[in-house]
Amino acid sequence: MELKATAGSAANLRLLAGEYLQLAIAQADLVQDAYDQTGIFADEEESRGFGAVAALYTETCQVVVRADSDIQSIEDLHGRTVSIGAEKSGSEQNARQILSAYGLNDKMVSMVNLNYEDAAAQLKAGRWMPSL
């Protein structure tokens, strides 16, 4: 078996569906969405045709801000710019779910699609504060 680096869970499921991978690691919620063709997989007819092998671990989601930030809670993200992960990624879906759970939508939070590396660079440079 050959190991390949990918963009994450959503990419892994798309690569698996396209038969570019034989085994993939993915977030459980995205596996379910791909199978049900909901969430970020709602418009993707080729997202099925796989089975689960094993559950690996419970995933922790982290919200990161600069040490000098006045943000102390998710509610403090109102009116801020937030990196929610790469477009159509598991990170984007989870970020939107978290913000929604706190009553925040794209009219209340400016959501930016950046991958981890770009979001970290922007955060470090102080261009905007939070990364979800």
What residue ranges belong to the model's regions?
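Pocket-flanking alpha-helical
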Residues: 4-43, 119-122
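Short loop/turn motifs at secondary-structure junctions
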Residues: 20, 49, 70-73, 127
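General beta-strand structural signal in soluble alpha/beta enzymes
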Residues: 5, 26, 52, 111-112
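Short, flexible segments with low predicted structural confidence
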Residues: 35, 48, 93-95
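Bilobed "Venus flytrap"/periplasmic-binding protein-like clamshell domains
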Residues: 1-2, 55, 59-125
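Generic hydrophobic, aliphatic-rich segments that mediate packing or membrane embedding
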Residues: 9-12, 49, 59, 73
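Alpha-to-beta junction loops
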Residues: 17-26, 80-82, 125-132
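A structural signal for short loop-to-beta-strand junctions that line the ligand-binding cleft
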Residues: 43-56, 61
